[in-house]
Amino acid sequence: MTTETLTKNYLWVEKYRPQNIGDCILPDSIKDTFRQMVESGESQNLLLSGGAGCGKTTIAKALCNELDADYIMINCSEDGNIDTLRTKIRNFASSISISGGKKIVILDEFDYANAQSMQPALRGFIEEFSKNCRFILTCNFKNRIIEPIHSRCTCIEFKIPNKSKPKLASAFLDRCKVVLDNESIGYDEKVLAELILKHFPDFRRILNELQRYSVAGTIDTGILTQIGEINTKHIAKQSRKQRSSKRKC
């Protein structure tokens, strides 16, 4: 069994990563933008910016899945140098896709890519392989990425409007319940809501914390001293409202 397979089977953030756009917990305006690309049958060159764990990489992968595109993902915080472009990316981008469509290169955490070498070189790659390949870049800090890259990509900012936060937090509460039920971990709903609100909208952090606390076999008030006291009545109330609404439909 490969390291990648072990990671997907063990880490909850990978095991329960949404595989399609509809299952991503994001504002509808963002999901609609990606759905339009699926309908057109082709991705654009994209620069996705926003806070850690908010769903940028997840929806990029979901887009590739729905387009049935051949893709590779490179984490630039670990592999953000010019040699990566000259070897891995060039070899991938220059070959023909098995499916016949365009290939996609996902460059995760691209704000860690070297701004003096890799970033300027990528500008040329985007143009050189435009007939065969698209590039999706994710970043936490878009100001660390040179302007010529911005101008060659469609920039999508992952901002959550205040009016959407209760709905998304509630949706993630329900998602966490499914995860815990699947893993046979007991939980106190209020404690679960407190953990979500503490780290919202960093969904990756929330799942990682849940997995860490789950070692004890249950998510209950025993972890409150680590989480801190947070008023979460409105998120639990919102979740009950949504479930009630679904039952009426």
What are these language model-derived features?
Residues P166-A193:
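Helix-loop-helix "sensor" segment of P-loop NTPases
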Residues G186-H199, I219-I223:
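Short conserved motifs of the RecA-like P-loop NTPase core
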Residues A193-K198, R204-A216:
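C-terminal helical "lid" of AAA+/P-loop NTPase domains
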Residues M1-S164, S170-A171, E194, N208-Q211, ...:
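P-loop/Walker A NTP-binding region and its immediately flanking N-terminal helices
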Residues P27, P201-D202:
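Short loop-to-helix capping motifs
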Residues N65, D181, L197:
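Short polybasic/polar patches that bind polyanions
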Residues A216-Q242:
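Loop-to-helix "switch" segment enriched in basic
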Residues Y10, S164-K167, L180-E183, L224-E229, ...:
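A short, ordered amphipathic alpha-helix with a cationic face
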